Regions:
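Surface-exposed, charge/polar-rich loops and edge strands
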Residues: 1-239
């Protein structure tokens, strides 16, 4: 099969495109391995005994992804919401309330999701769970840069110290209000995610490009092989 310069150019482009697809597939496999390694660490930390939180000065790394228990009183007056949080397709907000574990320290608790027509405002009074509570859940680092719960930004606006982590109550820790008004967040997904299926798709795309280019080159070469004898045949006999 003889290839023209144009054929070689097309083949080179196909190889480059296929190589990019293969690299994307390998990248997805790398992300899969990273996720599995991360999940293994999280699973191991969650299996450790629960930490009893009695101070807001605990380093976040000492409780990150671990089960914790804390007892205190709710400070509803300084409650925050995270807007634009959907739950099963319904607009709403996440409700974060400081739980005062002492007179001069508190930990923000993500009490769950509440429906909100504008995904911003809720009736805070209807979401109260009583004056005091014992909360069991998982600890996560408080997001930096979010002024509503960033401990650094809240340092001068609250009359007490705030922990550098947030508690998300366990799904089994039902709120003391109607479930239609406040729902605990489900447990975080520790599955593999879509990375493996994405990798397979990228590898499949690479195969399709190479196979398709090979078929196209064979077809073009076959067409040229048929056209050349036709041009060599005289249109009429010479007498």
């Amino acid at each position: 099969m003889k290839l023209t310069p144009k054929d070689w150019l097309g083949a080179a482009i196909a190889v480059v495109v296929a190589a990019v697809f293969v690299r994307l597939g390998i990248w997805q496999l790398d992300r899969l391995h990273q996720r599995r390694a991360r999940n293994a660490v999280v699973t191991a930390r969650r299996s450790l005994p629960a930490v009893t939180v009695t101070s807001a000065a605990l380093p976040v790394d000492s409780v990150r992804d671990r089960r914790v228990t804390l007892t205190g009183t709710w400070d509803y007056a300084r409650e925050r919401v995270w807007g634009a949080r959907t739950y099963e397709g319904v607009p709403g907000v996440a409700v974060l309330t400081p739980l005062k574990i002492s007179s001069d320290a508190a930990v923000f608790v993500d009490r769950g999701w509440a429906p909100s027509a504008d995904a911003l405002h809720v009736d805070h009074t209807a979401l109260r769970e009583g004056d005091s509570a014992t909360v069991t859940g998982l600890a996560f680092a408080a997001p930096r840069g979010r002024g509503d719960v960033d401990p650094v930004r809240l340092r001068d606006s609250l009359p007490y110290a705030v922990a550098s982590f947030i508690i998300q109550p366990s799904p089994s820790d039902s709120p003391a209000v109607r479930l239609s008004d406040l729902r605990r967040w489900p447990a975080s997904d520790l599955g593999d995610g879509p990375h493996l299926s994405y990798a397979i798709q990228w590898f499949a795309f690479a195969g399709i490009v190479l196979i398709g280019m090979g078929a196209l080159l064979r077809k073009q070469a076959s067409s040229r092989g048929v056209e050349q004898p036709r041009r060599a045949t005289p249109s009429s006999e010479t007498v």
